[in-house]
């Protein structure tokens, strides 16, 4: 099964960003790397369970020394906020109890749910739970995504489709979905439909177009600058110690020759 790879991890640093933004090298209990990973997983599971009707697309977690920032991207922000912010306050209090730190809760609205793969997968799963035929649910999701401006969509259902005795997988695809092109903006989502005859897995890939050459080059340049910035405090290698002063002197000589003479103007 070596050909299977996580769609997010495959594109990290190219078209995808990390959804947990923090660093830990501590050995103190509660602040170790594994502790933060388990805590992030618990936060996401709690939010998915409590906000199941809110259409949560993704949850981004950032950490500082004494604060946890949780960004919730949802298609129905009104459900997350609640009446006069009561629901948001309840969620924040629950997260503070879970983490033991001050929690900053930010809620963002997903403008176009038809182009969000996670929300499309949740929509198909809800229809399957409500006994809508799987072919009809897949066809409707495809049509909505293509009308919203997607260049391609791919949907896979796995399980006892239609209540069949033997489980199977069904693929539907419309348009172009280049999964091997790293410059392609591919959005991926997964959700499980809980039906009376078992669970059905729903996977959705939505192709939104390629990154332009300029965007790709800018992103690569920014990443290389970040890597060089992290290495700036290192000592030069042995072969580079003597070459560095010579290079600096050679670079300063042409600059001095090309610089125009200063002129003084009097009024």
Swiss-Prot record:
Keywords: Ribonucleoprotein, Ribosomal protein, RNA-binding, rRNA-binding. It holds the Pfam family Ribosomal_S3_C. Residues 216-267 are annotated as: Disordered. GO terms for molecular function: mRNA binding; rRNA binding; structural constituent of ribosome. It comes from the Bacteria. Residues 241-267 have a biased composition (Low complexity). Residues 228-240 have a biased composition (Basic residues). Signal peptide: none annotated. NCBIfam families: rpsC_bact (TIGR01009). This is Small ribosomal subunit protein uS3.
